[in-house]
Amino acid sequence: MTKASVAIVGSGNISTDLLYKLQRSEWLEPRWMIGIDPESEGLARARKMGLETSAEGVDWLLSQAEKPDLVFEATSAYVHREAAPRYEAAGIRAIDLTPAAVGPAVVPPANLREHLDAPNVNMITCGGQATIPIVYAVSRVVDVAYAEIVASVASLSAGPGTRANIDEFTKTTSRGIETIGGAQRGKAIIILNPADPPMIMRDTIFCAIPEDADQAAITDSIHRVVKDIQQYVPGYRLLNEPQFDKPSVVSGGYATVTTFVEVEGAGDFLPPYAGNLDIMTAAATKVGEEIAQKLLSVKA
């Protein structure tokens, strides 16, 4: 089967875990990994897997005679903002795993097929991939006046790139809660938990809804979205049934539904507790496969 050629830009934890997932793909063939640290473990592993590697950054990749069909970038927001127009000029489709938000944001259960022709798509954040689908599940049943998510992740799973992007995390995730999740207003909070042994990723999703909302329909919608996510992130699960509360002063006079989820990683390269990183790489792979299928069908 013909596959779309892929370059991974970045050689850190997320890029390395992504490499393992791409190796299993029926539609994507990882052929290059690009970094800036010649001693990075990611580049070493990629070389052992037969990929062409370079520590000379995006300049090296774009100087090659053969260009990839797709590039997955897991560097930092400011780096991707500079590289994105260069990818587009070279005719390379980009899947952005940073919070740069250069292109339209994609969350597979909500809008996977809406942006398959875009030159650049953004995977928002780990917290966004884990929680925005739940907000979307609620908002497709009733109006959501306000949605707030709290993403709690193991401190050990947050490398320098994640820490450098904390401000962008909250802004990009909050915007995604509104534009994709469907909430009128959204807010995102991230907690880096220093507990040892490290805790699994856990997320709380709070939605303000009308008092007369159909609770059974909301619960059913949430369960359907969870099943959709489990197709590419098997370790994604509800901790308990959605909890409904009557209007109160705290909720601004709205009734509320609160959902608790946890995300256990597949353990490809990252440990299972790093579900926050795993859901990013799994969602990016899912999006990349859809883009590749359409790209290859056009070429055929």
Swiss-Prot record:
Gene Ontology process terms (BP): catabolic process
Keyword Transmembrane helix: no
Gene3D superfamilies xrefs: Dihydrodipicolinate Reductase, domain 2, NAD(P)-binding Rossmann-like Domain
Pfam families noted in UniProt: AcetDehyd-dimer, Semialdhyde_dh
SUPFAM superfamilies per the UniProt record, alphabetical: Glyceraldehyde-3-phosphate dehydrogenase-like, C-terminal domain, NAD(P)-binding Rossmann-fold domains
Recorded family membership: Belongs to the acetaldehyde dehydrogenase family.
Record's protein name: Acetaldehyde dehydrogenase 1
